C-alpha cells in the first residue's frame, strides 16, 4: 500500500 492508501493497514 502507500502512505495513506491502505484499507486495513
UniProtKB/Swiss-Prot annotation:
Gene Ontology CC annotation, any one: extracellular region
Molecular function in Gene Ontology: neurohypophyseal hormone activity
Top-rank taxon: Eukaryota
Family annotation (PROSITE patterns): NEUROHYPOPHYS_HORM
Location within or outside the cell: Secreted
Glycine amide, modified sites: 9
Keywords: Amidation, Disulfide bond, Hormone, Secreted
The keyword Disulfide bond is annotated on this UniProt entry: yes
This protein's record includes keyword Disulfide bond: yes
Disulfide-bonded cysteines: 1-6
Similarity comment: Belongs to the vasopressin/oxytocin family.
Its biological purpose: Potentiates spontaneous contractions of the gut and also pulsatory contractions and bladder-shaking movement of the nephridia. May be involved in osmoregulation of the animal through nephridial function.
Name used for this protein in its record: Annetocin
